[in-house]
């Protein structure tokens, strides 16, 4: 039956799309131009120092190095490191084989973090551990440094309950008789090559989730920038009044959001082609003699939760990257979250959304089966035309077109549902691997994570059996070409192998979709038989 041919076409189109997607992504990201980087943007390092403080609210735990006051480690307390781990997920860390840090400071002519100084400021604090209490609305963690000329620098970390954004506030008191000129900077640095322990699942085949740098500016709401570009010194140098800079990975992001002090500079840099840096630098900030100035910026360290990121900075929620099918993935995700709020199980929500999608496309499915039934009825006439004009292929085409017009049949009518189902399928895939809400989301029995593959491959096998059943009730006896018939008979095996490494939530969607296909096929074809 033509439906088997359609399955094969679907597979071909899907694989072709994966290859095109990988090529398109590479071409798009390589369009950046090499920029000359000012020496002030060069890598700012921190001395190895055992003096650290620990800051914690109910969702994040931070480790701050007192040299410069950089965030060297950050753990997300609401997210496990792995599915069966009791440890919280560590987003930022400083180790022997991997570095991922959020740095900030004051640079420029009079900035204590300027590269012209021998070292960065060594701050002090009145204690080592700071924890937000159960009934507290805000945790303020001040660290201080006194310069040789008497300037007092106070850097304060401000955390609020159940929030992943951290306010960084510099309070600079200038008691001297001269003005001070400096710039605030914020940058994120990360080792480009992941160690084995962090190199975990991030997608399948060509549809990998993005890991790299990103930024938002006056001209671009959201732009990704590959680590490879930074490693090869093809760096950014962008002036903008709005925006942010970030480093992204599957489900999580670290971002600096500067205060609007005028034209900020967004830049990238690298160290020995092994460490990538993206950052921003503010315009010059003047602090008059005998005066105080407050300078602020904001740091996001956490999961890519769209509704929360929207509140922190414009366009920060765009880091939840659903690819070019975002216009389908976004409403699908919103619908899925509504269903989850009612049902309380992501797996059953996926099942219900499958019924909704198949219900919406039912008119097209019905038209597909009617078109295929008419095509089957025309097979004797088509065969007669082929035999009659076997030596004239052009005449065969002309006669078949006339036959289709006479019988009022569109030979491509059976393909429309496939072109509808393919983007739905892909958008659901992007949603599953890009939405942190589905990370480690359980279903039933052995399925403990709908965003990763079935550990025992049970769902892919069930999916293959549903395809085999569809093939049996459809029958391939009408296919005259022996090679094509063998391909059709082998399709369930091909698809089963194809789906082994797909997220179990996606395989669940396809199983339910196949079951709906079986029901709809039996119903529509039985009605067609009755109406003959």
UniProtKB/Swiss-Prot annotation:
Whether Cell membrane counts among this entry's keywords is yes
Question: Which GO MF term does the entry hold, naming one?
Answer: membrane insertase activity
Q: Name one GO cellular component term.
A: plasma membrane
The places in or outside the cell where this protein is found are: Cell membrane
Q: How does it sit in the membrane?
A: Multi-pass membrane protein
Protein family membership: Belongs to the OXA1/ALB3/YidC family. Type 1 subfamily.
* Protein name (database record): Membrane protein insertase YidC
């Amino acid at each position: 039956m033509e439906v088997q041919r359609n399955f094969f076409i679907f597979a071909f189109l899907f694989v072709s799309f994966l290859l095109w997607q990988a090529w398109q992504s590479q071409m798009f990201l390589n369009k950046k131009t090499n920029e000359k980087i000012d020496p002030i943007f060069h890598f700012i390092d921190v001395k190895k120092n055992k003096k650290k403080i620990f800051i914690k609210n109910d969702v994040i735990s931070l480790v701050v190095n007192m040299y410069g006051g950089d965030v060297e480690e950050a753990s997300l307390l609401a997210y496990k490191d792995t599915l069966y781990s009791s440890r919280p997920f560590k987003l930022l860390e400083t180790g022997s084989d991997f570095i991922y840090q959020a740095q900030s400071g004051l640079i420029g002519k009079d900035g204590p973090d300027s590269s012209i100084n021998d070292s960065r400021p060594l701050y002090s604090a009145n204690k080592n551990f700071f924890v937000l209490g159960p009934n507290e609305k805000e945790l303020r963690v001040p660290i201080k440094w006194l310069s040789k000329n008497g300037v007092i620098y106070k850097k304060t970390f401000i955390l609020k309950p159940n929030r992943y954004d951290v306010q960084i506030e510099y309070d600079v008191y200038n008691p001297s008789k001269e003005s001070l000129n400096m710039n605030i900077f914020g940058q994120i640095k990360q080792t480009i090559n992941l160690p084995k322990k962090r190199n975990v699942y991030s997608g399948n085949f060509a549809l990998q989730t993005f890991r790299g740098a990103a930024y938002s500016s006056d001209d671009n709401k959201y732009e990704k920038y590959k680590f490879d570009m930074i490693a090869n010194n093809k760096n950014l140098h962008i002036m903008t009044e709005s925006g942010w800079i970030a480093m992204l990975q599957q489900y999580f992001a670290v971002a600096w959001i500067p205060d609007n002090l005028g034209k900020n500079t967004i830049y990238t840099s690298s160290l020995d082609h092994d460490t990538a840096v993206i950052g921003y630098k503010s315009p010059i900030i003047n602090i008059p003699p005998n005066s105080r100035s407050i300078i602020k910026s904001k740091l996001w360290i956490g999961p890519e939760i769209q509704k929360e990121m929207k509140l922190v900075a414009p366009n920060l929620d765009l880091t939840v990257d659903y690819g070019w099918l975002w216009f389908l993935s976004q409403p699908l995700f919103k619908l899925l979250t509504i269903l989850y709020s009612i049902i309380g199980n992501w797996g059953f929500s996926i099942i219900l959304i499958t019924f909704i999608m198949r219900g919406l496309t039912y008119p097209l499915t019905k038209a597909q089966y009617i078109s295929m039934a008419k095509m089957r009825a025309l097979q004797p006439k088509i065969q007669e035309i082929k035999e009659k004009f076997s030596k004239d292929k052009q005449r065969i085409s002309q006669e078949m077109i006339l036959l289709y017009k006479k019988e009022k049949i569109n030979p491509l009518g059976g393909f429309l549902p496939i072109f509808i189902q393919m983007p739905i399928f892909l958008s659901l895939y992007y949603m599953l691997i890009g939405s942190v809400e589905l990370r480690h989301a359980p279903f039933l029995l052995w399925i403990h994570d709908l965003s990763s593959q079935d550990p025992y491959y049970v769902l892919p096998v069930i999916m293959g059996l549903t395809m085999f059943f569809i093939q049996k009730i459809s029958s391939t006896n009408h296919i005259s070409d022996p090679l094509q018939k063998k391909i059709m008979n082998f399709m369930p095996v091909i698809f089963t192998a194809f789906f082994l490494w797909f997220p179990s939530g996606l395989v669940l969607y396809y199983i339910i979709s196949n079951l709906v296909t079986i029901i709809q096929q039996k119903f529509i074809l039985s009605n067609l038989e009755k109406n003959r």
